[in-house]
Amino acid sequence: NKVLAGWNGLAITGLVAAWRASAHTPALALALRVAKFIRDRMVNGDQLARVHHEGTTKQLDGTLDDYAFCGAAFLELAEATGDRAWWDLGARLLGAARTKFVSEEDGVLVFYLAPAGDSLLVHRPESHQDGAIPSGASIFTAALIRLGVVAGDADALALAERYLVQRLTGPTQVNAWANSALLA
């Protein structure tokens, strides 16, 4: 039994959406159960573990996908339950993601998949294309907008706006098919 933070963050978001659409209480209960597992076993301060396997946290720090998917899921859960603690946890993880994964390279804003100094990687990849699942950058951008609009976090909103303008116009313009979640 392996728990991947990011995939479970997506599951939480999906379960909350199912509950909102159907008022099916077990969906919200399951979302809370999964979120509590992540909070209790995979979060340490502002660090989110990527993998929990057989009772042990396997990798101390997650990727942008993990932070974005879980951070956004916790914001969703806060709005669904009215429990401010979920919002605070989501905001804390998204704040950590700003520090770990956001960089500026030659005037271009980059959202990296891995944190700087990750000793497991030879190359530090960017997170900017959606595939079978949305990219961490897309979900991170949407969560930054939510923090800006709902909580009045002007820095989060400015970062999201800058990233969107940069990715959707000019020399770094991206393919719309590869960025459907970013455009949503």
Model-assigned labels for residue ranges:
Residues 1-184:
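Glycan-recognition and catalytic cores of secretory/periplasmic carbohydrate-active enzymes
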